[in-house]
Swiss-Prot record:
Protein's name in the database: DNA repair protein RAD4
Main location: nucleus
Assembly and oligomerization: Interacts with CML19. Calcium is required for this interaction. Binds to RAD23B and PTAC12/HMR/PAP5.
The protein's role, per its UniProt record: Essential protein. May have a role in the nucleotide excision repair (NER) pathway. Promotes UV tolerance via dark repair mechanism (nucleotide excision repair).
Gene Ontology CC entries for this record: chloroplast; nucleus
Compositionally skewed regions (Basic and acidic residues) per UniProt: 37-57, 806-833
Acidic residues: bias regions: 76-88
Pfam family, one: BHD_3
Alphabetized InterPro entries for the sequence: BHD_2 (IPR018327), DNA_repair_Rad4 (IPR004583), Papain-like_cys_pep_sf (IPR038765), Rad4/PNGase_transGLS-fold (IPR018325), Rad4_beta-hairpin_dom1 (IPR018326), Rad4_beta-hairpin_dom3 (IPR018328), Rad4_BHD3_sf (IPR042488), Transglutaminase-like (IPR002931)
Effects seen without this gene: Probably lethal.
Length: 865
């Protein structure tokens, strides 16, 4: 019975080994690119027949379970089997799969792969931004940038709070306060302070409620817990309290300058990835030699025995427990953890774990080591899961979120570093010192674009993006116009310069106690040198940027250029020194790139073509704008039967030499005009007079002139010339201007007289209408009063007679009274001219009779149909 069991184990182990070797060969050929797919119905019948799939990548876990079950793994304790590395699954009987007498060792094990890759074209959402969308996106970008600048100034102002600084100094051990007395500050002097901050404060992932930042900072100091921004601000306040020149540095993660960029980031799979914080790859954050080790807290007596400024053990690797603690803290506090080697994914790690389990299951064929082998399999599983831990790097990995990306840190000026001192990068959250070269990779891993990095001090700000961005060409197109950005930062740079070089003076200026203009020139001269040295350093970084490895980067690169990616109106002249090669293409300095124009375009700059010059480039003219260009240039060069455009460089031009004006005659072109693109295009001895209808004055005096054509107006695919003023000889300038001024005065006088006459006519009409109204009132006022008195008497008599009549009868009586008034009014003077006003008209709806009345009492009844 025992030999039968051993034969089963040997045959099954051999089959497992053959299957694993095949899987390893196929996975190495494919590079583990497919996604792992678990087979839930992998029974013995399917293993005999095999399953056809698109690829081969996922190992059947059922095989390993059968091997472990047959080798006695069922005797393991329940506590060990409940580990998260194991899962329950049905185990088919071995009798159906292994025949005791006839075992076919050559049968194959087929493993399924799912190599379905989503089509990138289907995932890409087509979005075409309009001109209005682009303008709106640029405005949003600028407003967001200004808001983040204001936020940085608020944080910097809170760091100068004397109460917060005093509270931090009261918590700081006395041996760490000696750094304020040092004349030369180095990196090793700041390391103990940073270590103390990391030991006494922790990062809280949830931000504070809606409070002012100063209040939130005080609460974080009291609770020893806060956001990454608050901890960075506390570190700045602590170092400033120790009289160290410190700046608060922040990445301004503004809205995208392109309209559809933010929309695409938050749609589809990107939204899910940002929600769960899972990235495909992990990026190097900082070399472990530069990371500050976090050791457990020691007693005060033990700490005092050490030197207060002992150099940190940067070269000694951390222990295994410390590595695990640092990984947990990094993933919670700053969105950082341990990364896998290269670009391995979760599926690759799981795949290797299963292979390790299968290999360990077939490594030992003895029954006596069942439990030990099971523990060994579990140990190998844990090791394979943590095999991505490297002793040389600390990096970001799965679980990082954009909200936890390294957005803020601080810079400390160490005058003991180098000869002139330098600004040292200090990250109090992640425990990094002088690791500025790793910020770009950390921001990229956390899905943060490193477009603007601004340092704040005493209400001022300075752009230090060049210090942390090594690939400027990747962000240059994502930044706003440099002219606008420099104009915004101009007043802030002045404040920051004073803050980083003289803290007391800058603080008084920021609080309004001392104006900036009262600063002593002697104290600012040395400080200006430090600022100039920093500007020189940033400019040097820009000029010494490494060559991009992607050809597309050379299209709009500020320093380098490739001839292949030049515009059609650009050329290399001269072909300067070759700085390197990219995919076999030589790389030239951007200063060698020259812009080509037509000779008519060069005339606008006051340049003309030299004699015997050959066009540097000939381009085919677009048929859509052919007529426009022909009319504008006045020349239609036909080369080989097609309309072409000859382009010339600036080195082929010379200053414009036009014929001078002689005997008061203005030289004109073939169209009888002068093209005045600029003042350089005027013929010698002439002047351009930009006044409307001034040609009439010159024509009246018989002075020679030429219309001045200043440009074109494009409408409906055509060009219309724009004329403004005239060109005359210089000697006639004063005469024409005086005559034009006199003519303008005459026109103004005529206009004034015309307005006065029109006003007098309107007043006459108004007064005449008033007189007519008064005359009519005086003539007919008495007659109208008598008629009203008589009508009142008639009405009173009618009312007395109709006292006992009902309401409808009273209305009829009133109508009869009105008729009697009409009869009496007929006996009046026939010479009276009756006037019927609309206000005196009445209408009876029952009888459909309209009554018209005059002021004298005369009335007329009209029946309307």
């Amino acid at each position: 019975m025992k030999s039968r069991s051993e034969s089963k184990n040997c045959r099954l182990a051999q089959a497992s080994r053959v299957a694993v070797n095949k899987v390893l060969d196929k996975s190495s050929a494919r590079g583990s690119r497919g996604k792992k797919k678990q087979d839930d119905n992998c029974d013995s019948a399917k293993r005999d027949k095999g399953v056809n799939g698109k690829g081969k990548q996922a190992l059947d876990a059922r095989l390993i379970d059968n091997v472990l079950e047959d080798r006695g793994c069922g005797n393991v304790d329940d506590d060990e089997m409940n580990d998260s590395d194991w899962e329950d699954c049905p185990i088919p009987s071995l009798d159906s799969t292994v025949d005791d007498n006839n075992v076919d060792d050559t049968r194959e094990l087929t493993i399924e792969f799912d190599d379905d890759v989503p089509d990138a074209k289907k995932q890409k959402n087509a979005y075409r931004a309009t001109a209005e969308d682009k303008v709106r996106a640029e405005l949003v970008h600028k407003v967001h940038l200004l808001c983040l600048l204001a936020r940085g100034r608020i944080v910097d102002s809170a760091c100068n709070d004397p109460l917060i600084q005093a509270a931090l100094l009261s918590l700081l051990p006395s041996y760490l306060t000696k750094v304020s007395n040092l004349e030369k500050v180095t990196v090793k002097d700041i390391a103990p302070l940073l270590r103390w901050v990391r030991e006494n404060f922790s990062v809280s992932c949830s931000p504070s409620s809606e409070k002012s930042f100063r209040t939130s900072l005080a609460f974080a100091l009291e609770s020893r817990k806060g956001t990454a921004e608050e901890l960075a601000a506390l570190a700045v306040a602590l170092l400033r309290a120790l009289k160290l020149t410190t700046r608060f540095v922040s990445i301004l993660d503004v809205a995208s300058l392109k309209p559809g960029a933010d929309r695409n980031e938050s749609s589809g799979q990107n939204r899910a990835k940002m929600k769960h914080g899972i990235f495909r790859t992990s990026t190097l954050m900082v070399p472990k030699q530069q990371a500050i080790s976090s050791y457990p807290k020691k007693s005060s007596s033990h700490v005092k025995n050490k030197s207060p400024f002992e150099k940190p053990q940067l070269g000694n690797p951390l222990g295994s427990d410390q590595v695990q603690d640092n990984a947990v803290n990094s993933s919670c506090e700053a969105g950082m953890s341990i990364k896998s080697d290269g670009t391995r994914r979760k599926g690759d790690v799981e795949f290797e774990r299963q292979i390790a389990m299968a290999l360990s299951a077939t490594a030992d064929n003895q029954q006596s080591s069942q439990v030990n082998n099971t523990k060994k399999v579990r140990e190998i599983t844990k090791i394979s899961n943590s095999s991505s831990v490297s002793d040389q790097v600390i990096s970001t990995a799965f679980g990082s979120k954009k909200v936890d990306s390294p957005l803020c840190w601080l810079e400390v000026y160490c005058n003991g570093e180098n000869m002139d001192g330098k600004w040292v990068h200090v990250d109090a959250v992640n425990g990094m010192i002088d690791a500025e070269q790793n910020i770009e990779a950390a921001a990229a891993a956390c899905k943060t674009v490193l477009r603007y990095v601004v340092a704040f001090a005493a209400g001022g700000a300075k752009d230090v993006t060049r210090r942390y961005c090594t690939k400027w060409h990747t962000i240059s197109s994502k930044r706003v116009s440099s002219v606008w950005w420099d104009m915004v930062l101009a007043p802030l740079v002045h404040l920051e310069s004073g803050a980083t070089h003289d803290e007391d003076i800058a603080l008084r200026n920021f609080n309004g106690l001392n104006p900036v203009s009262s600063r002593a020139s002697s104290s600012s001269s040395s400080f200006g040198i430090r600022s100039a040295l920093e500007d020189m350093e940033l400019a040097t970084r820009a000029l010494t940027e490494s060559l991009p490895t992607n050809q597309q980067a050379y299209k709009s690169h500020e320093i380098y250029a490739i001839e292949k990616w030049l515009h059609k109106n650009q050329i290399l002249h001269p072909k300067g020194p070759v700085l390197g090669f990219c995919s076999g293409h030589p790389v030239y300095p951007r200063t060698c790139v020259q812009t080509l124009k037509t000779k008519e375009r060069w005339l606008r700059d006051g340049l003309q073509l030299k004699a015997n010059e050959v066009p540097s480039k000939i381009l085919k003219r677009n048929s859509k704008f052919k007529k426009v260009k022909d009319f504008e240039d006045g020349d239609n060069n036909i080369k080989g039967g097609s309309s072409c455009m000859e382009l010339y460089g600036k080195w082929q031009m010379e200053p414009l030499c036009l014929p001078p004006a002689v005997n008061g005659i203005v030289p004109k072109n073939e169209r009888g005009q002068v093209d005045v693109w600029s003042e350089k295009c005027l013929p010698p001895g002439t002047v351009h007079l930009r006044f409307p209808r001034i040609f009439a004055v010159a024509k009246r005096f018989g002075i020679d002139y030429a219309p001045a054509m200043v440009g074109f107006e494009y409408r409906s695919g055509g060009a219309t010339p724009i004329f403004e003023g005239i060109v005359v000889c210089t000697e006639f300038k004063d005469t024409i201007l005086e005559a034009y001024a006199e003519e303008q005065e005459k026109k103004e006088e005529e206009e004034r007289r015309r307005n006065e006459a029109q006003a007098a006519s309107r007043w006459y009409q108004l007064l005449s209408s008033i007189l007519t109204r008064e005359r009519l009132k005086n003539r007919y006022a008495n007659n109208s009063n008598d008629v009203e008195a008589k009508s009142l008497e008639v009405n009173s008599e009618t009312v007395v007679k109709a006292k006992n009549v009902k309401a409808p009868e009273k209305q009829r009586v009133a109508k009869r009274g009105e008729k009697s008034r009409v009869r009496k009014s007929r006996n009046e003077d026939e010479s009276h001219e009756h006037v019927f006003l609309d206000e005196e008209e009445t209408f009876d709806e029952e009888t459909s009779v309209k009554t018209k009345r005059c002021k004298c009492g005369f009335s007329v009844e009209v029946e309307q149909m």
